[in-house]
């Protein structure tokens, strides 16, 4: 199978494969996506005997990792026609995608997995989970607050009302998507095209403290984005949904894993689960290590450590890299060997290095998981240089 970037002539076949594997052409999201958001220049296709049998859409995002804004491709619509499955096409598609992203100078890529195990074998690991709360609407009453007023949004130009709330919510988090006017309008446009609602809660000064994105029409009300700057804002939104008891039976909402409000829920024995949400993978080790900042307070003097990285998919990442710290928040990195050197301080697999940089897992925990090996003083040092973060992202496509 030959892989290349799509052209406009490929669009009918790209649409057909999406409709075969995901939403049908009549679906509102399909129509919105291919009318407003599809970019052939950011889509990789696999062609065999003139037939387009495999695709991945490389959605362009900027994600915030440890305070640095990194251009990133969010892989969505990873699809292979059943006629071409179980022949290694999926792995080849991912490899060619990584080669393309490396050519573009990107260091990290992300994707939302339908099955994490498929991608883990190729070096992806989960960096963001979410809480999923499900409960009968009647059970919301003890969690409500009546001090805030409600409002509804109905125009993409109202993105400016949501942006300050999102910025405040993500201020101390890691791995989230930066949203500007373009991203907000694209997002709100997709919501309104699909008949999705956006509710806000406001204080007496008219300042919006929180918002929720939700859909009606089924016994369970799904809330796919739940963002708030205060606990009373969350409770105010739950009060809003409590008023929907005649329009639904239960509610299900997602929230960041950093939120510890579950500790104060009167009855949390049921309906409280975690959802594996987003995976990440290093595209290029040198680029990733030189663009993700370190904790400068932990770097007291110049120091170099040799890190052996194992990557069974991308040979350019497999080898020993000299990581030099001490001059700034961004290290210097040089690949010193494709195989091994006499002195190796740390050995880590590509997935482990990814979640370490993303802040999802500490070096000590990676040792426990068997993804990192090294002397204890180097493990402690890594945890000072790359301290664990509260990770979050809520981009569905």
Where are the predicted features?
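Short amphipathic alpha-helix that is part of the acyltransferase structural core
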Residues: 1-60, 67-74, 141-183, 217-221
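Short hydrophobic/aromatic beta-strand element in the GNAT-like acyltransferase core
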Residues: 41-45, 55, 77, 195-200, ...
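Conserved active-site alpha-helix within GNAT-family acetyltransferase domains
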Residues: 103-107, 113-131, 236, 258-274
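Intrinsically disordered, low-complexity, positively biased terminal segments
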Residues: 12, 146-397
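Conserved catalytic-core motifs of GNAT/GCN5-like acyltransferases
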Residues: 63, 112, 125-142
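Conserved GNAT acetyl-CoA-binding A-motif
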Residues: 94, 99-113, 246-256
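Conserved acetyl-CoA pyrophosphate-binding loop and the N-cap/start of the following alpha-helix
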Residues: 84-96, 232-236
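Hydrophobic adenine-recognition pocket in adenosine-nucleotide-binding enzymes
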Residues: 6, 78-80, 226
């Amino acid at each position: 199978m030959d892989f290349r970037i799509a052209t406009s002539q490929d669009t009918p076949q790209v649409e057909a494969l999406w409709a075969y594997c995901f939403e049908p052409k009549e679906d509102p999201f399909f129509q919105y996506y291919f009318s407003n958001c599809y970019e052939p220049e950011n889509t990789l296709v696999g062609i065999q005997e003139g037939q387009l049998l495999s695709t991945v859409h490389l959605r362009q995002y900027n994600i915030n990792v440890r305070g640095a804004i990194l251009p990133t491709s969010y892989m969505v619509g990873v699809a292979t026609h059943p006629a071409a499955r179980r022949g290694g096409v999926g792995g080849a598609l991912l490899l060619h995608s990584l080669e393309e992203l490396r050519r573009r100078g990107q260091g990290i890529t992300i994707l939302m997995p339908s099955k994490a195990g498929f991608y883990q074998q190729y070096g992806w690991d989960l960096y963001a989970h979410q809480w999923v709360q499900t409960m009968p609407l009647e059970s919301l009453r003890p969690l409500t607050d009546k001090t805030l007023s409600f409002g509804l949004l109905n125009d993409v130009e109202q993105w400016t009302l949501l942006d300050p709330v999102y910025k405040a919510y993500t201020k101390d988090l890691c791995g989230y998507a930066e949203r500007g006017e373009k991203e907000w309008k694209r997002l709100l446009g997709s919501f309104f095209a699909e008949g999705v609602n956006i509710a806000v809660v406001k204080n007496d000064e008219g300042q919006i403290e929180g918002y929720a994105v939700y859909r009606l029409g089924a016994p369970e009300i799904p809330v796919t984005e739940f963002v708030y700057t205060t606990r009373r804002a969350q409770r105010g939104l739950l009060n809003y949904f409590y008023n929907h008891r005649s329009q639904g039976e239960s509610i299900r909402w997602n929230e960041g894993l950093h939120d510890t409000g579950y500790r104060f829920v009167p009855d949390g024995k049921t309906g409280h689960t975690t959802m594996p949400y987003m995976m990440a993978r290093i595209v290029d080790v040198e680029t990733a290590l030189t663009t993700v900042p370190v904790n400068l307070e932990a770097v007291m003097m110049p120091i170099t450590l040799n890190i052996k990285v194992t990557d069974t998919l991308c040979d350019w990442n497999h080898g020993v890299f000299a990581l030099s710290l001490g001059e700034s928040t961004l290290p210097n990195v040089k690949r010193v060997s494709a195989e091994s050197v006499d002195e190796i301080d740390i050995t880590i697999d590509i997935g482990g290095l990814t979640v370490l940089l993303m802040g999802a897992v500490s070096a000590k925990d990676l040792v426990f998981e068997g993804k990192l090996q090294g002397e204890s003083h180097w493990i402690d040092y890594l945890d000072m240089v790359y301290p664990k973060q509260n990770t979050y992202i809520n981009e569905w496509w």
